[in-house]
Structures are given as C-alpha cells and as structure tokens.
Amino acid sequence: VVCLFTSLGYSADRMDDQRAVDAATVALKPGALFVLDVLNGAIVRKDLVEENCQMEGEVRFTLQRRVEGDTIIKDIHVDDQGCSHRFIERVHAWTAEEVQAMIARAGLLLEELTDGPDTAPFDPVTSDRIVAWARKPR
C-alpha cells in the first residue's frame, strides 16, 4: 500500500491521518510493505516562497503561502479573463518524529526513512520529503 505525494495531512483532525494509516495496515498482508510520502515541514518552512504568479494562456494564477502553527496554507487566486476564483489548501507540516509515531501506532515496523523514492537517506535539514518504508509484521 502506498500513500504518495502528501496524500495525508489535509484534515484538521490528525486522527483522520492515523485512521487512514491504521486502515492501510489492516489491508496489508503480513510481511507486506507500506510506503508513506509527505513533505518535510522543516524544509517547507525554511524555503517557503510566500507569493508567486504564473500565466497559463489567458489564465493568471497567484499563489500565496504561509505557515500557521503546524499548517502550511496555500491561497490560490485564479483570474480567467475577469472571472475570479479563490481556493485555499491547508496541509500539515510533518516532522519525521510525527511520521514515525503514526507508523508505530498503526503496528507497522519502520524499516527506513528516505528523501524520496530514490532512497537517499532522510536528512531533517536537507530532505524535501519524508518517505517512510514500513512493514506489517509476519
């Protein structure tokens, strides 16, 4: 079972994320692998681009980002030839310790933390992502 591209962390209730990992654990056969991929909150905080604009044809996208507590907030403004839309995305700024604790609470055995699918070792100061490789006990 895989949860890639920060598929967790969008609910205001952290227990929703735990329930998702618990459900994945139930679905796994003994000895099977679970992979969880989330943004490294420390890097997001450090390298946050507060605002940028981009054009896609005639459509202008303005993205504003900020961190409030342990949440990364992205405010997306879309202007399509005078018709405006606004979307707000909120995602949890994960730490490796939070990911490890969630894996352990689900009863999985953490094998490794990496900085993405290339399996470079996770470094809390430089890794863009936290990828947990965990196995369901036999």
Name each model feature, range by range:
Residues 1-17:
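A short SAM/SAH-binding and catalytic strip from SAM-dependent methyltransferases
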Residues 2-5, 37, 114:
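Short beta-strands and strand-loop turn motifs
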Residues 15, 35-102:
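SAM-dependent methyltransferase
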